[in-house]
């Protein structure tokens, strides 16, 4: 999403989206 956790690709992020 766009925070600092890690989505599918790893280049994206979670908590912020």
UniProtKB/Swiss-Prot annotation:
Organism: Supella dimidiata
Main function: Myoactive.
Signal peptide segment: none
GO BP annotations listed: neuropeptide signaling pathway
Sample GO molecular function, one term: neuropeptide hormone activity
Any one cellular-component term (Gene Ontology): extracellular region
InterPro entries: Pyrokinin_CS
Keywords: Amidation, Neuropeptide, Secreted
Modified residues (Leucine amide): 17
Keyword rRNA-binding: no
Superkingdom in the source lineage: Eukaryota
Family: Belongs to the pyrokinin family.
Subcellular location: Secreted
Protein name: Pyrokinin-5
Main location: secreted
Secreted keyword on record: yes
Source taxonomy: Eukaryota, Metazoa, Ecdysozoa, Arthropoda, Hexapoda
């Amino acid at each position: 999403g766009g925070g600092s956790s890690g989505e599918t690709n790893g280049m994206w992020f979670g908590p912020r989206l």
